[in-house]
Amino acid sequence: MKHTTFLFAGHLTASCRRLILSSAILSFSFLPSVVTAQTQDGRDFSIDGFAAYEGNPGTNWYRAGGTTGGAGGKVVKANTFSQLQAYLQSSEPYVVIVDRDISTGIKCYVDNINTGHLLDDQSGASGEETTYGERIMVAPNKTLVGVVNPETGKAPLFTHITFVMQAVDNIIIRNCRFTMKGVPVLKSGENKIVALRNGVQTEVGDPDCIGIQADKNSAKTDWGAHIWIDHCEFFNGDAGNKDRYDGLLDCKNNVQWLTFSYNLFHDHDKSCLWGKSNSDIYDGCRTISFHHNFFNNIQGSRLPLQRGGHVHYYNNYMLDCEDGWDLREKSVAYLEACYFENTKSPVRSDRGGSLNINKTDGYDCIYKGCNNLMEGYTNIDGAKSSSLDVTATDWVPTQTTATYTQHYLDKTADVPALCQKYSGAGKVKIWTAYADAIPQEDITEFDHAIKNPDPGNAAKTYDAEGNEMKGATSAISATERSAAATARVDYFTLSGVRISAPRHGVNIVRSIDADGHTVAKKVVCN
């Protein structure tokens, strides 16, 4: 194992510049969030690669200190989809802690989970039950961190929620799981996520788990930068056809300084698309460090499909996959110490891209049971294979950045074991790097977040029934008040204890009309 830092003379490394801070989080009074150093088994899991780089001074993509996410903002806890949506879409910096699975929770019925077509009859008399999807327009200066459930040993799972980063800067997402499995779509439309908004089935976008882009106004002028996706898990499972779901982690347009590290991608078809077409190429676009990621059972392609951009691709493991990393139009990359096993076509640069390969002893690529190998390689198990031409380049990351930090370059033979141990969510205790204690819900802060969306997107927050929220306080509806005049309204705490009147926070309100019909809902009161 090499622990390496690349440095041009006259500059400090990103790791030396990184601030080491401390935090103190109280149950109801929050101090600004900060990040502490982080190791496990003696291994450093803090940020490195292009996301740690500040960028070039004088450009849109410059940020002092590199990617810091919500550092300096409040640490908050999201227990519901509405809270998650409000905090991540707010104009304020936040570190958002989640310790439970989250979906919209709004039931709907489809013909089949593998196809997901919404039925005309939503009574539940037929079809399979699933939940409506939704979209979160992630605003700048946000950190999202999952906490492992001690009973299940799993990190929080976000189901049918697409996280869109549209022309934004400074985002961190760590230790979370994502899936679109079973997301509903319209029978007559494309495969777009369908949400229930104000009682109306509404298409809200492609079924990407995470989509990074910069084409809100114009792809020629918009930009995004400084994004770190780390220790996350992405999957979808069986699908009716290869177009049922979209990407797990897609990236397009003019975005720079990204690191995707220690992630697990599995059970999917089209995994990662970086560049939506051959025209989606800009000077300096999509500078990505991609390391210690584990692709398992991707029965399709895009590990990733790269168009344009500069990618440092190292210490990644492919197992039981089909088409792998495909370097297309004007893509440039540096490949180090990756292990490819039982994969049809792990990497190719013969269709418009160019590749530099580290062939140092112990750090060259290893193939086992694969087909379509790069020229000059053979399988270590002797399996027969075809050969692909390599289009060469001499590019290395330090040609693009003034400084470049790479914590580790592990030997290729060690990569399968390392990725199986550390790649994915729930493998490393991450949240303690951001808070000393898990905070409590804060209704006042939730209300503030709803009322202060980022002006760049002006995205709305929706409640547990799909209705737009104007704030974190709500009252009993007019219908319920009318019913109360002839019957009664009862109030309960979340634990089921009956109370005489609503209290500050979340209450259960049960109304019974004159005909004996009962309606129960959660109500948030200031």
Residue ranges and their predicted role:
Residues R18-L31:
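Bacterial N-terminal signal peptides
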Residues E134-V138, L157-A167, V185-L186, D208-D222, ...:
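Glycine-rich beta-solenoid repeat tracts in large extracellular/virion proteins
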Residues T473-N526:
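C-terminal outer-membrane/trafficking sorting elements
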Residues L31-A37:
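Sec/Tat signal peptide C-region and signal peptidase I cleavage site
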